[in-house]
UniProtKB/Swiss-Prot annotation:
The record marks H190 as: Stabilizes free radical intermediate. It is an enzyme of class 1 (oxidoreductase). It comes from Selaginella uncinata. The chain crosses the membrane at residues 29-46, 118-133, 142-156, 197-218, 274-288. This is Photosystem II protein D1. The keyword Transmembrane helix applies. Pheophytin a binds at Y126. Photosystem II (PSII) is a light-driven water:plastoquinone oxidoreductase that uses light energy to abstract electrons from H(2)O, generating O(2) and a proton gradient subsequently used for ATP formation. It consists of a core antenna complex that captures photons, and an electron transfer chain that converts photonic excitation into a charge separation. The D1/D2 (PsbA/PsbD) reaction center heterodimer binds P680, the primary electron donor of PSII as well as several subsequent electron acceptors. Its main location: plastid. [CaMn4O5] cluster binds at D170, E189, H332, E333, D342, A344. Chlorophyll a PD1 binds at H198.
């Protein structure tokens, strides 16, 4: 009898815990994905803040020339970053217990790998939590689908690219100037500006910004006034009201006359789907582009491809970009190698017997 009561009490405790985790009445929804999301994101955030402030220099290139990234070692908010894990570690899983000491772990950039892996797991769980909450509320799953675009982009630069290049040292540093350094080096080594998937990503981001501004301004300009001239038009909206808050017919007519009739949506649902899908698809393509360039399937190369009838090269913008790429690559890891691979491959070592 005692055993039966104890089992019931345990089952009741577990049931109460499950109900609390999956309850949509909580101020913040937790969910089963949240059980993993909360500790991983807290770990990534706390280690990031600590390392950004106080981490010692990291031997990123594996040549015993540490690079400083923290505030206490001379950086500011702009120049500071979490330096990627050393090239000496490569793609090895490098938790604290794999190093001989904490000092060695810090010197080889262990915090970067810890932060990145916890962060990626955390944002993936956040996406799952969005789907879970939508499911429990009877909503459609498109919020999680939209969020998959930035998750894919983060996974591409922090995980897929290092895997393709063979080392976490090639991942994007966690800082402002480190991000720009990553972009410049990526252009130098992969010619990303000439990759069609990057072009689609640019169209997605800038186009999404344009469409968002157009939609917001059209709605704001065609509000149905519920207030007097002396009050703000925004004060006429009541949260949860059933009436339309703006006149879509007026907005449609305005935009149709401004451009042409069929450039304007007459269906609010299709309009908002388009506003969501355009930037999401663009960022998906960018993430796919980064993932292909990770394995050196690079952007188009039109170097010296335009020639006259005599075979002489007519320089184009592609050749200017190529020259800029070589210059950027020369500056990158200047102490790790003397020449970028493009130049080194074209220089034959002198023969001693020749």
């Amino acid at each position: 009898m005692t055993a039966t009561l104890e089992r019931r009490e345990n089952a009741s405790l577990w049931g109460n815990f499950c109900d609390w985790i999956t309850s949509t009445e909580n101020r913040l929804y937790i969910g089963w994905f949240g059980v993993l999301m909360i500790p991983t994101l807290l770990t990534a955030t706390s280690v990031f803040i600590t390392a950004f402030i106080a981490a010692p220099p990291v031997d990123i290139d594996g040549i015993r020339e540490p690079v400083s990234g923290s505030l206490l070692y001379g950086n500011n908010i702009i120049s500071g970053a979490i330096i990627p894990t050393s090239a000496a570690i490569g793609l090895h899983f490098y938790p604290i217990w794999e190093a001989a000491s904490i000092d060695e772990w810090l010197y080889n950039g262990g915090p970067y790998e810890l932060i990145v892996l916890h962060f990626l797991l955390g944002v993936a769980c956040y996406m799952g939590r969005e789907w879970e909450l939508s499911f429990r509320l009877g909503m459609r799953p498109w919020i999680a689908v939209a969020y998959s675009a930035p998750v894919a982009a983060a996974t591409a630069v922090f995980l897929i690219y290092p895997i393709g290049q063979g080392s976490f040292s090639d991942g994007m540093p966690l800082g402002i100037s480190g991000t720009f350094n990553f972009m410049i080096v990526f252009q130098a080594e992969h010619n990303i500006l000439m990759h069609p998937f990057h072009m689609l990503g640019v169209a997605g981001v800038f186009g999404g910004s344009l469409f968002s501004a157009m939609h917001g301004s059209l709605v704001t300009s065609s509000l149905i006034r519920e207030t007097t001239e002396n009050e703000s038009a925004n004060a006429g909206y009541r949260f949860g009201q059933e009436e339309e808050t703006y006149n879509i017919v007026a907005a449609h007519g305005y935009f149709g006359r401004l451009i042409f009739q069929y450039a304007s949506f007459n269906n609010s649902r299709s309009l908002h789907f388009f506003l969501a899908a355009w930037p999401v698809v663009g960022i998906w393509f960018t993430a796919l582009g980064i993932s292909t360039m990770a394995f050196n399937l690079n952007g188009f190369n039109f170097n010296q491809s335009v020639v006259d009838s005599q075979g002489r090269v007519i320089n184009t913008w592609a050749d200017i970009i190529n020259r800029a790429n070589l210059g950027m690559e020369v500056m990158h890891e200047r102490n790790a190698h003397n020449f970028p691979l493009d130049l080194a491959a074209s220089i034959e070592a002198p023969s001693l017997n020749g």
